[in-house]
Amino acid sequence: MTVAHILIVEDSPDNMKLFRTLLTLKGHSVTGIPGGEELFSTLAGGRPELVLMDIQMPGKDGFELLAEIRASEYADLRVIALTAHAMSGDREKAIAAGFDGYITKPIDIRLFPEQVLSALAGEAPQGG
């Protein structure tokens, strides 16, 4: 099993707790922040192998934050969209914007750890 440092950018405390629990139970090191204000200072403190980012957040949304990441020294980070947007075309929009994968919320707690492993392996996870 691949054990990794994962950064979660998620404004919902309940979702953050769930994601953190599922990933730490699999042995991953997890850092969680509630939004973009802390993103670059957190990245400077330790580069994660993977970023899981909510798309709809107060302040800057996930698309804006991703654009900032892609224009920075962290441009090569793997960033996976975490979103409740599950309508036709939403996944394509996220991938076109530069996300490396797309996981819908609410997540399937049985599949989520495997989706993260796929992302760590360089694959593009999809679905919920």
Kindly label every feature range from the protein language model.
Residues 10:
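Conserved acidic carboxylate
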Residues 13-31:
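Two-component/phosphorelay signaling modules centered on CheY-like receiver
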Residues 33-37:
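Conserved Asp/Asn-Gly motif in the active-site loop of CheY-like receiver
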Residues 46-52:
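Active-site beta3 strand of CheY-like receiver
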Residues 54, 83:
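Active-site residues of response regulator receiver
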Residues 57:
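Receiver (REC) domain active-site loop signature in two-component systems and cognate sites
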Residues 107-116:
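C-terminal output helix
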